[in-house]
Amino acid sequence: MTKKAAIIGGGVIGGGWLARFLLNGWDIKVFDPDPEAERKISEVLKNARHALPMLYDQPLPNEGTLKFCTTIKEAVSDADWIQESVPERLDIKHRVFAEIQDSCRGDAVIGSSTSGFKPSELQEGAERPEQIMVTHPFNPVYLLPLIELVPSIKTGTQHIETAKDILTSIGLYPLHVRKEIDAHIADRFLEAVWREGLWLIKDGIATTEEIDNAIRYGFGLRWAQMGLFETYRIAGGEAGMAHFIAQFGPCLSWPWTKLMDVPELTDELTQMIADQSDAQSGHKTIRELERLRDNNLIAIMRALKQQGSAAGALITAHEDTLRMPLGAAVPMRTVSRSIPVDWTDYNGHMNEGRYGQIFSDAADAFMIEIGADAKYIAAGNSFFTAETTIKYLAEALAGQTVHVKTRVLLSEGKKVKLFHEMRAEDNAILATCEQFMLHVNLTTRKSCPPLAEVQSRMDALAQAHKESA
C-alpha cells in the first residue's frame, strides 16, 4: 500500500522533510502559497538526490510521486503523515492546524517542525489535540537523522507509536522527549552556544570564523560521535565521570560563561556579525556551501557507519530494511548503489580500489544468496578470494548510480568462479571482474568443500547461469 505524506510549508525545513519522505518511496502532496515554492523545493530535492543515496550501500526505494496543491484540504485529505513547517508564529500555526483537522483523517500524525513552541501550546483550541505533536528536525532533514519527538499529555499513545515507526522507517532517529519544555533539548544547547558566541564577538575576543574554527577543529568532532556526557566521561580517565565532576565541578562558580546575560542585538553588532560572516564565507554561494556541508556530513556519517557508532549505526539499521533478495534473475543483480563522495580521488572519479570494493560487495551478496551468510561464517566456514582480474572501462563519478550483475561461471567442489559487470544507469559497462574463490575452513585456514546445502545452491546457480548463457 502506498504511503502518503502532506507537507504544509515548503521552505528549507519543509523541503527537507519532503525530500526525506519522497526518496524513501512516499507519495507527497505539498501546499505552500509562496509562488517560488516549487523552485525552492526543486533546489532542496536536487541536493537530496545527490546526497542521501551516498549514505547507503543498498539502493533506496523508488521515489514516490510529488504533487503541488492549491489548498491545504487537497494536500492532507488522504495523508498518513502531515508535517507543518510554517513560520514560527503561534497564531499562524493554530490557523493551519484548524484547516488541517477540518480535512485530514483522525488517525493521521500531525507533526510540527517548531523549534521553540511546546506541543501543549500548539494543541490549544485544536479539534483533536491527540493528533498533534512536535517533530523537530535538523537541517538538512534529508541527511541528519535526529527528530525531537515531543508529545504533550494530550497526545495519543497510538499516535506517538505510529510516529516513531514512520520516522524510523525512513531512516530518522525519533528522540522521545518525555517532558515538554521550551526549545526542547538540542536547541537549548544551541542557544547557549549562540549567546556565548555573541558576547565573544561583541567584546572583540573572537570573530565568527575563529568561533567556528574552535568548534569544527575541536569539540565539534568529539560531539559528532560521542555527545557531551560520554566525551566528559573519557576526560575523567579511568576514575570515570564522578572523577571528572569532582575535578571540574568548582569551575561552575567561575566566570566562564555569560549564559543568562544576553548582549543586545544592536544595529552595530548585527552589522559586525554580518561583515565578519561575509569575509569568512562570502566567496561561496549558498548552493556551494550546502553541497560542501552535505559532502562533509556524508563522509563523517559513513566513517561512523564503518565503526557501527552513533548516526552510522542508524544508517546500517535502516540499510538492512532496504536489502532485497537477489531473486531468480540471470545474471543476478548483486549491487545497486550510489557512488559516495569519499570514494573519489584527485582525478574526480572513483578510485580503482573502490571498484574492487564494489565487486567484493557483489561477491558478499552472492555468498548470502547461497547460504554462506554471517551464521555460516560464525560456524567456521567461508570463502576466500584467490584471484581477481578487473578491467576498468569507464569512469564512475560521485553521486552516480551503478549496479553489478553477477554470473556464476564455475561451481566445482571447493572452487567457485564469478563474473561481475558494473554498469551505469544507461546500462553502459563501467568495469568487469572475474573472481576465483576457494571455500575455506576458518579453524585450519585451509581449503575444503563447502557444506552440502551451500554446495547444492552453488551448483544450481551455476547450472541455471550456464543454461541462460
Regions found by a protein language model. Give the residues of each.
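Hot-dog-fold acyl-thioester-processing enzymes
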Residues: 326-386, 442-469
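NAD(P)+-binding Rossmann beta1-loop-alpha1 motif at the extreme N-terminus of oxidoreductases
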Residues: 1-54, 103
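Active-site-proximal catalytic alpha-helix in oxidoreductases
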Residues: 16, 141-144, 150, 170, ...
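Hydrophobic beta-strand-centered segment that forms part of the acyl-chain substrate-binding groove
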Residues: 366-416, 430-432, 438
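Rossmann-like NAD(P)-binding element
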Residues: 33-36, 51-109, 117
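NAD(P)-dependent Rossmann-like dehydrogenase/reductase catalytic/cofactor-binding core
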Residues: 2, 24, 172, 206-327
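Rossmann-fold dinucleotide-binding core
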Residues: 112-178, 183-187
